[in-house]
């Protein structure tokens, strides 16, 4: 009633919203959005704008973005269905409603890469698809896994009691795997946030098409969907359902020059080679290059969105490298005034002697926790013969142990302003964890949906060292 009176509209009529009219914007912001913000709403989604004139849609995004950042206590943020001109300037984009299907899942990497090509790193889609189609757990998981290593992870779908968007409405296996990937995404926030900063400052896209460096894959259906996720990771999306007999997805991928490691298993893949591998529903092909330094949050209280006191840093052996972690409050615009902290993580690699130096290099104190607990995870690395830890000139105690193929050094209560130095010495420290075909085959045989006697015969032919009665 108040809005109708202000606009002098005919009572009970439908108002055609016009973002080019200042009075309409007054109604939108002062009578509708600002009261909702005062109730705790963080940002708004411009949806159902498909029929709006392009100029008006651009104006709507422009004014809503500016209004959402009207004070320095909160950064501007909107989610919009259309970006129109200069789409990288304003909203996080929403790809529209798509049918739930393997066909539409296959289109998503193409959209990721094309968005990156026009400077839009923050592009989103409905995890699991939006409407229609035939839902199944495997398809849902592949949506979740792709989105875990995508710009924006966002669950959404059409209304209806038969749609299954929430992880907990699925079977126990699907729910458990989904939860693992959602926790992994949360743990990766320090890395993703730093890569977002790099995009803002240097223009380096969060998603970089693989064909930037290997142009021949552009027209190759097997490899054209691969992409770099930030500076340290390579993603080779799974877009096909599994083979019903093997209970695995048969997937081909290309590993670029150098040495690469499976992010989860740590298996080693020599580069500049094509591979074929077999992936269970809980597996996803994501690789870190030799020397990769990846910061993870190591907190157990997953709902805490503050900067973590516990930080896990995974380092893959073989090459020296430096990674600069960027942190700020994540909410306000005070980072523009220098309220942030940059922390350099230097990895100096020798086969028998490697050192990690963590030191604050730029910004202000008081941004991150005063002290931190560091868990250094040296992937595919044997236990060192000796470990020495210093903070500045003070020698510290550490907890050192082996977990599978990884060597762990834990140091607690380290001040975040200053220099932490960890030196490890040992003979032939790197574990040669090259992907073992025999391990893959044996694992596949276990899951094959064939007669068990036939499994034993196949095993005997392949391995030749087992006998059965």
PLM region spans:
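Hydrophobic residues embedded in beta-strands of well-ordered beta-sheets
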Residues: 233-234, 352-356, 407
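Residues that act as N-cap/strand-start positions at coil-to-secondary-structure junctions
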Residues: 219-221, 247, 280, 339-341, ...
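Accessory, solvent-exposed terminal regions and/or long lumenal/extracellular loops of proteins
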Residues: 290-394, 413-469
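Residue-level detector of beta-strand structural context in well-folded domains
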Residues: 224-225, 251, 343-345, 398
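Catalytic-domain carbohydrate-binding cleft regions of carbohydrate-active enzymes
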Residues: 1-289
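Generic beta-strand structural signal
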Residues: 228-229, 255, 349-351, 402
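Conserved, charge-rich beta-strand/loop surface module that forms ligand/interface-binding patches
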Residues: 63, 69-76, 96-99, 104-111, ...
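Solvent-exposed beta-strand/loop surfaces of large extracellular or lumenal domains
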Residues: 261-281, 386-412
């Amino acid at each position: 009633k108040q809005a109708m009176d202000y606009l002098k509209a005919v009572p009970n009529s439908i108002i055609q919203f016009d973002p080019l009219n200042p009075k309409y914007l007054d109604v939108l912001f002062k009578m509708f959005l600002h009261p909702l913000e005062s109730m705790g709403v963080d940002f708004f989604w411009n949806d159902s704008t498909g029929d709006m004139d392009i100029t008006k849609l651009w104006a709507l995004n422009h004014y809503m973005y500016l209004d959402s950042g009207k004070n320095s206590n909160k950064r501007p943020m909107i989610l919009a269905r259309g970006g129109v001109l200069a789409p990288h300037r304003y909203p996080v984009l929403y790809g529209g409603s798509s049918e739930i299907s393997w066909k539409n899942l296959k289109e998503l990497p193409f959209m990721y890469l094309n968005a990156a090509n026009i400077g839009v790193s923050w592009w989103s889609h409905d995890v699991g698809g939006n409407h229609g189609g035939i839902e199944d757990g495997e398809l849902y998981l592949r949506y979740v896994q792709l989105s875990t290593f995508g710009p924006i992870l966002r669950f959404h779908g059409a209304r209806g009691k038969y749609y299954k968007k929430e992880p907990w409405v699925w079977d126990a296996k699907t729910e458990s795997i989904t939860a693992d990937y959602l926790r992994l995404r949360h743990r990766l926030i320090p890395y993703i946030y730093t890569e977002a900063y790099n995009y803002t400052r240097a223009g380096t896209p969060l998603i970089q098409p693989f064909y930037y460096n290997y142009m021949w894959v552009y027209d190759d259906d097997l490899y054209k969907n691969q992409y770099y996720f930030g500076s340290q990771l390579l993603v080779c999306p799974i877009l096909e359902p599994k083979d019903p007999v093997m209970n695995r997805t048969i997937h081909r991928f290309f590993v670029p020059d150098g040495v690469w490691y499976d992010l989860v298993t740590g298996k080693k893949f020599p580069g500049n080679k094509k591979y074929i591998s077999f992936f269970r529903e809980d597996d996803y092909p994501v690789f870190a290059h030799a020397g990769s330094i990846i910061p993870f949050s190591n907190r157990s209280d997953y709902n805490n969105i503050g900067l973590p006191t516990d930080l896990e840093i995974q380092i893959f052996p073989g090459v020296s490298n430096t990674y600069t972690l960027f942190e700020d409050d994540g909410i306000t615009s005070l980072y523009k005034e220098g309220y942030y902290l940059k922390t350099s993580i230097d990895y100096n690699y020798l086969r028998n002697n490697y050192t990690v130096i963590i030191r604050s290099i730029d910004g202000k104190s008081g941004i991150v926790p005063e002290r931190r607990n560091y868990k250094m995870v040296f992937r595919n690395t044997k236990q060192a013969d000796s470990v020495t830890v210093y903070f500045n000139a003070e020698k510290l105690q550490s907890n050192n142990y082996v977990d599978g193929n990884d060597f762990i050094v834990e140091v607690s209560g380290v001040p975040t302003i200053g220099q932490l130095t960890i030196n490890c010495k040992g003979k032939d420290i790197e574990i040669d964890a090259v992907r073992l075909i025999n391990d893959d085959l044996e694992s596949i045989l276990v899951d094959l949906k064939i007669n068990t006697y036939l499994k034993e015969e196949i095993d005997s032919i392949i391995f030749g060292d087992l006998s059965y009665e």
